[in-house]
Each structure stands twice: as C-alpha cells, then as structure tokens.
C-alpha cells in the first residue's frame, strides 16, 4: 500500500528526494504562487515554521501556475521571490501541476486522502494539507484559511 513517504519530489534547486526524509515529522504541504491574492500567507506560514520547526514540523511549498497564471517563473525564481519578499526558509520545490493530466503524484495522493469541500480537485493556490507524524493526511484547508487559523490543528499533532 502506498504511503506519503513513498513519493519523490524535487527541490527548487533540482535535487530529488523521498518524503521519507520527513518520517516522524508533522508536514504542512501547500501549493503556492507568488502573484496571488493569498501570497501574503507566506508570512504566516514562515511564522509557523519558525515557531514549530524544532518540534518536528515542516512546511513544503510547491509553486503552481495553474490558477490565473500567478506563478510565471521557474521554481527557483519562485523560491528566491519568497525568500526575498517574505523571508521564507522552509523547503520550496520545483513548479508543479496540482491537477490535470500532469498532476504531481503526491498531489493526486493528497486530494484522494482529503477530498475537501470541492470534492477532489484543488481549486486555487494555497490549499493546505496537514500530515501527522505517522504519515496520515489528516486535514485539508481551503486557500482562505490563514496560517494562524490552523495553528491549533498543528499544535495537536506535535
């Protein structure tokens, strides 16, 4: 049976790795865009990461250009933009598709595990998936849900 730890992803620098690198950690996996109305959420995400990273919490950002063309650059450009404008230090990855024919398998797995209000498909940037220390996808948060609003859910898993 497939688990979240079986998936291979690629960092914004082009390095591939398996998510088993985060076995035992709480993960928040987010599709991001640097020209979106929700882009200011990077500040809140970074605050959560800084507050809880030493307790086994990680945020994984995946730039996506499928919603309004709001991530026009490369994954590396997106990561640089996030670091420069929002101080992002959590792991950022290559630009990916979160739906459709070229959907990253990880996001197929996440959407199957937590269907969300709109059934399976991700409808916009900054959809967030919370994964517990055992690798279970326990919650899906809509883009409108600000990072501060999900902090209690993260704390419960730490």
UniProtKB/Swiss-Prot annotation:
Q: Does the keyword Oxidoreductase apply?
A: yes
Molecular function via GO = peroxidase activity
Among InterPro entries, the record links this protein to: Glutathione_peroxidase, GPX_CS, Thioredoxin-like_sf
Against SUPFAM superfamilies, the record matches this protein to: Thioredoxin-like (SSF52833)
Q: Supply the Gene3D superfamilies for this chain.
A: Glutaredoxin (3.40.30.10)
Cite the entry's keywords alphabetically: Oxidoreductase, Peroxidase
The active-site annotation reads 36
Gene Ontology BP, a term: cellular response to oxidative stress
Source taxon at top rank: Bacteria
Q: What pairs make up the disulfide bonds?
A: none
Q: List, alphabetically, the Pfam families matched.
A: GSHPx
**What family is this protein classified in?**
Belongs to the glutathione peroxidase family.
Question: Which PANTHER family does the UniProt entry name for this protein?
Answer: GLUTATHIONE PEROXIDASE (PTHR11592:SF78)
What name goes with this protein? Glutathione peroxidase homolog BsaA
Q: Which organism is this entry from?
A: Staphylococcus aureus (strain Mu50 / ATCC 700699)
């Amino acid at each position: 049976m497939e688990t979240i730890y079986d998936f291979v992803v690629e960092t914004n620098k082009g390095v591939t790795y398996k998510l088993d690198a985060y076995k035992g950690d709480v993960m928040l996996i987010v599709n991001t865009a640097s020209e979106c109305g929700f882009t200011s959420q990077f500040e809140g995400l970074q605050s959560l990461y800084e507050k809880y990273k030493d307790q086994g919490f990680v945020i994984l950002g995946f730039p996506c250009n499928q919603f309004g063309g709001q991530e026009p650059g490369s994954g590396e450009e997106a990561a640089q933009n996030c670091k420069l404008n929002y101080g992002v230090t959590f792991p950022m990855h290559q630009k990916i598709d979160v739906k459709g024919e070229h959907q990253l398998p990880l996001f197929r797995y996440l959407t199957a595990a937590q269907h969300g209000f709109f059934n399976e498909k991700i409808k916009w940037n900054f959809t967030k998936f919370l994964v517990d220390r055992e690798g279970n996808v326990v919650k899906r948060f809509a883009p409108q849900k600000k990072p501060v609003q999900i902090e209690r859910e993260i704390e419960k898993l730490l």
